[in-house]
Amino acid sequence: MSHTDTIVAQATPIGRGGIGILRISGCATKTVAKEILGKLPRARYAEYLAFKDPEGNILDQGIALYFPAPHSFTGEDVLELQGHGGPIILDLLLKAILNLPDVCVRIARPGEFSERAFLNDKLDLVQAEAVADLIDASTEQAARCALHSLKGTFSLRINQLIESLTYLRVYIEASMDFSDEEIDFLSDGKIETQLDRVIHDLDKVRSEARQGQLLREGMKIVIAGRPNVGKSSLLNALTGRETAIVTQIPGTTRDVLREQIQINGMPLHIIDTAGLRETEDPVEKIGIERAWNEIEQADRILFIVDGSTSSEKTIYPLWPEWEARLSRSRLPITLIRNKSDITGEDVALTETEEGTFISLSARTGEGIDLLREHLQQTMGFSGNMEGGFLARRRHLEALENAAQYLLSARQKWSSGNFLSELLAEELRLAQQVLSEITGQVSSNDLLGIIFSSFCIGK
């Protein structure tokens, strides 16, 4: 599809509401306005007008807003029609626009308005992604950080790194251009000092980006264990409500239950699973297989044991089959010794060579705050994101790649035995992957993936 087409889409959620908005962008916007409204509204002024179909029938009445290029969200001529939020009314108005004679207007693809804003230099790629992140924010802190990204906080940090790398490259390439002259650009210590400064600044951005990624995506916590050890009780204790059915009958939970909570602004996706055991029940077997699938994708596993029937404080003596199914080294596990109210164990968190275990009571809630603190610490989430920004996995990957290139450049420099061309190439590669974050360098495939995840009207 061409980026020169005029596009239209509903900018408000599908369904009934007090207000429904259609957004039009492109070169035929003025013609659409004259056909539907009978006039071109005054730029950036709200006008109350009738919305008509091609036969002149009034479909609705509402507010029309016209934003001429380039002073609009997309950088193109944009018209917004704000009418009543009934789906039938909006559908009739949308059909009227699409069926205008001698005017080519099509339905926008998901994220196409934001994509055009990016292509017309109204937003960089980080800011465009922040539009979707602001809409999808699940916590107040995530919304604030998404707004910071939209305002350019993250982009500014990346551009400062790129600018520093540009300075370094100029300095090194100058030494290559004047290699036959009696001018030594590389012996005054500036390269080493500047390179160390860039590496330090990049490390700070990476640390903040990891916090931003946690805030955006949250942490997936899977509650696992044998039947009837208190998994569902722990889910209820963490969420603060009776989310799961709790009985003394083993196998009560047969499917995956999902809930979301917050710890100091960080979203946690808590997943309760079926008790893991050998069974002949075909329905329970399906639930157990789903439990394993969730376990394999977890950021952290809370493996619960009944403290009143077991004295073990690590998972592997309790269940050797666990290690056969999943690798011990890559599984972040916290052992939960439940029912401290029955055993009399002290509510506490203990670190051992085998891992971490917490004694608590899911029934009374004793030790739940300790578990919350533990989850926050294990993910490295500080909770202090004042002035911070959100980040995505692709941002973290680009920052990690840039760090590797810079460390390679630093090692070459420290060895004292290097070619200036190789040093300059490492810096160029670092600069290139950083530029991919903001979209200064990007592939069409990457843009398609990013913008296709947006809602239609954005």
UniProtKB/Swiss-Prot annotation:
Q: Which NCBIfam families match?
A: mnmE_trmE_thdF (TIGR00450), PRK05291.1-3 (NF003661), small_GTP (TIGR00231)
Pfam families to which the protein is assigned, alphabetical: MMR_HSR1, MnmE_helical, TrmE_N
Where does the UniProt annotation locate this protein? Cytoplasm
> What is the species listed in this Swiss-Prot or TrEMBL entry?
Hamiltonella defensa subsp. Acyrthosiphon pisum (strain 5AT)
Q: What is its main location?
A: cytoplasm
Name this polypeptide is given: tRNA modification GTPase MnmE
Q: Where does Mg(2+) bind?
A: S232, T253
GO terms for MF: GTP binding; GTPase activity; metal ion binding
Q: Which residues does the record give as GTP binding sites?
A: 228-233, 247-253, 272-275, 361-363
**In its keyword annotation, does this UniProt entry include Coiled coil?**
no
How does this chain assemble? Homodimer. Heterotetramer of two MnmE and two MnmG subunits.
Q: One GO biological process from the UniProt record?
A: tRNA wobble uridine modification
**Which family does this protein fall into?**
Belongs to the TRAFAC class TrmE-Era-EngA-EngB-Septin-like GTPase superfamily. TrmE GTPase family.
GO cellular component terms given for this protein:
cytosol
The free-text function statement in the UniProt record for this protein reads: Exhibits a very high intrinsic GTPase hydrolysis rate. Involved in the addition of a carboxymethylaminomethyl (cmnm) group at the wobble position (U34) of certain tRNAs, forming tRNA-cmnm(5)s(2)U34.
Q: Which InterPro entries match?
A: G_TrmE (IPR031168), GTP-bd (IPR006073), GTP-bd_TrmE_N (IPR018948), GTPase_MnmE (IPR004520), MnmE_dom2 (IPR027368), MnmE_helical (IPR025867), P-loop_NTPase (IPR027417), Small_GTP-bd (IPR005225)
Return the broad EC class: hydrolase
Q: Record-annotated residues binding K(+)?
A: N228, T247, I249, T252
- Residues annotated to bind (6S)-5-formyl-5,6,7,8-tetrahydrofolate: R23, E80, K122, K458
Query: What are the boundaries of the signal sequence?
Result: none
